[in-house]
Design a protein with these regions (language model features):
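Non-catalytic, surface beta->alpha helical segment in thiol-disulfide oxidoreductase systems
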Residues: 75, 80-108
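Conserved redox-active cysteine motifs that mediate thiol-disulfide chemistry
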Residues: 28-42
C-alpha cells in the first residue's frame, strides 16, 4: 500500500512537527527538478516500509519557501530527519534507496 507524503504548509507546520514521539522525515523537493522526481518514489518507498515508526512529510521548495528557509535548504532533493521539529541529520542530493534507508533506520 502506497503511503502518500503529507504536505507541510507554512501556516501549521511547526505544530505538526512538535510533540510527536516518532521521528519526522521531511522531503524537500521542487517540481522542476529531475533528481527530485527520481527521489520522490524512493522516499515514498521508505514511507511504505517505515510509516509505523516515522512520520513522512513533503515540502515543495517553490510553494513553501519560508519552510525551506527555516531549514536552510540550499539544494534539492533533500531529506531532513527531525525529532520534535529539530534537525538530527540531512541527506542532500539524489541517493539510492539502500543509502537512504541506512540513514533513516538509525532514527527509528
Amino acid at each position: 500500500m502506497r503511503h502518500e507524503l503529507e504536505r507541510l504548509e507554512q501556516a501549521d507546520y511547526k505544530e505538526k512537527l512538535q510533540g510527536k514521539a516518532k521521528p519526522q522525515m521531511i522531503f524537500f523537493t521542487a517540481e522542476w527538478s529531475e533528481p527530485c522526481r527520481q527521489m520522490q518514489g524512493l522516499v515514498e518507498e521508505l514511507a511504505d516500509a517505515h510509516y509505523a515508526q516515522a512520520d513522512f512529510y513533503q515540502v515543495d521548495l517553490d510553494e513553501q519557501p519560508l519552510i525551506a528557509g527555516d531549514f536552510n535548504i540550499a539544494g534539492v532533493p533533500a531529506l531532513v530527519i527531525c525529532r520534535e521539529g529539530k534537525e538530527e541529520e540531512r541527506i542532500v542530493g539524489l541517493r539510492a534507496y539502500p543509502d537512504l534507508e541506512k540513514v533513516v533506520v538509525k532514527y527509528l
